[in-house]
UniProtKB/Swiss-Prot annotation:
This is Probable endonuclease 4. The gene is nfo. HAMAP family: Nfo (MF_00152). It comes from Finegoldia magna (strain ATCC 29328 / DSM 20472 / WAL 2508) (Peptostreptococcus magnus). Binds 3 Zn(2+) ions. CDD domains: AP2Ec. The lineage of its organism: Bacteria, Bacillati, Bacillota, Tissierellia, Tissierellales. Zn(2+) 2 binds at E141, D173, H207, E252. Zn(2+) 1 binds at H67, H107, E141.
Length: 277
């Protein structure tokens, strides 16, 4: 089945994430390269990176995902904040290159009452200043649509991808899709439209989260797997979809390591049962 893991902290050292993966039976994971609510980034010593690379090779932990800071806004109404976002993304590109990580998930941003059209243009303008010459894959995340948030429908994401001068990809988030009004019990209908307008091959990462908030609420509140208003079966409709095989599945549910281990085991068990039937 797809590689599966969760969001992990690197506060105790980048190499410690591999040990955490082994604890919870994960074969991938996601992390922040800097303070997710700010811009500060820890300088990671080469010795720590080398240890990380050694351990991930030994234990076959791959398709690791780096998630950009929440505070970066490529379509801010302030030019200084737009420039800062580009600067931080480029710094992150260099950092993940050193870690030999390709997948980078990015929230597209909020237009701050400038309007959807202007916001999308600013996102493209900023994205075009990012250096991905070493093969990094920037994955625009599907968003819930709260406030002036962009990226909450296929057409908006298609505009960004089709107008950018660098290759872009997509991370689909089950909670965000549900909250933005996408029915996951009819997920193949969504994939059909996505394939027509963007191409399913552009989907590179799956965030698997249940939702605390009701369908179409445009609010981003994650719940534990199968314990929210989406439910286990509709989440399986997404993560077990044949058209999305080989994409890393990342849990961002409100859990500690023990909770993530239980969810990962539950998902693997259901996948194996499905394969046997």
């Amino acid at each position: 089945m797809n590689r599966i893991g969760c969001h992990l902290s690197t506060s105790k050292g980048l190499h410690k994430t591999i040990e955490q993966c082994l604890e919870i039976n994960a074969d991938t994971f996601q992390f922040f390269p800097r303070n997710p609510r700010g811009s500060k980034s820890r300088l990671i010593p080469k010795k720590e990176i080398d240890k990380f690379l050694e351990l991930r090779k030994i234990h076959n932990i791959n398709k690791i995902v780096c998630h950009g800071a929440y505070t970066m806004n490529l379509c801010s109404d302030r030019e200084d904040l737009r420039k800062l976002a580009v600067k931080l993304i480029n710094e992150d590109m260099k950092k993940i290159q050193d870690m030999r990580i390709n997948h980078y998930v990015l929230h597209p941003g909020s237009h701050k009452n400038q309007g959807i059209e202007e916001g999308l243009k600013l996102i493209v303008e900023g994205i075009n200043k990012v250096d991905v010459s070493n093969g990094q894959m920037i994955c625009i995340e599907t968003m819930s649509g709260k406030g002036s948030e962009l990226g909450c429908d296929i057409d908006q994401i298609a505009y960004i991808i089709n107008n950018a001068s660098i290759p872009l990809y997509v991370c689909i988030d089950t909670c965000h899709l549900f909250s933005s009004g996408i029915r996951l019990d009819n997920f193949d209908d969504y994939l059909d439209e996505f394939d027509k307008k963007i191409g399913i091959d552009k989907i590179k990462v799956i965030h698997c989260n249940d939702s605390m908030m009701p369908f179409g609420a445009n609010k981003d509140r994650h719940e534990k797997f199968g314990k929210g208003l989406i439910g286990e079966q509709d989440l399986f409709n997404v993560i077990f979809n044949e058209r999305l095989k080989d994409r890393p599945i990342i849990l961002e549910t409100p859990n500690d390591l023990d909770g993530y281990k239980i969810e990962i085991e539950e998902i693997r068990r259901n996948f194996n049962e499905l394969r046997q039937n």
